[in-house]
UniProtKB/Swiss-Prot annotation:
GO molecular function, one term: isomerase activity
Keywords: Isomerase
Keyword Cytoplasm recorded: no
EC number: 5.3.2.-
Transmembrane intervals: none
Name of a matching Pfam family: Tautomerase_2
Organism this protein belongs to: Bacillus subtilis (strain 168)
Identification of the protein by name: Probable tautomerase YolI
Family: Belongs to the 4-oxalocrotonate tautomerase family.
Active site: 2 (proton acceptor)
InterPro entries linked: Tauto_MSAD (IPR037479), Tautomerase/MIF_sf (IPR014347)
Amino acid sequence: MPLLRFDVIEGRDEKSLQLLLDTAHQAMVEAFGVPERDRYQIVHQHPANELIIQDAGLGFQRTKDMVIISMTSKARTESQKEKLYALLAERLEKKCEISPDDLMVSITENGDADWSFGLGEAQFLNGKL
């Protein structure tokens, strides 16, 4: 049940944001094999001066269309992560017109004890999930 946070520069319309979220979710479902219904996404829009993402010497040309995806998820294999990165870059460019130069992804891994979906319970630990 990955939790995805999208940080973008403010000013995107609702339709383009929804397409971004839908496209990223489909890539995650395919790369990680999570159920379609497991969808947890947060969008945070920032003024341009609040997102300072330099190219780290890799030659990226960042624009106002920059997207940072921060994911919290249980452990995944390197090949699953590489597949996700490739699918995101390919599909966001094709469907959302977001250049691969404008995509940054970070994954933080956690375990079953690190999730509560409500009611003060750890559903992965108590067998409800």
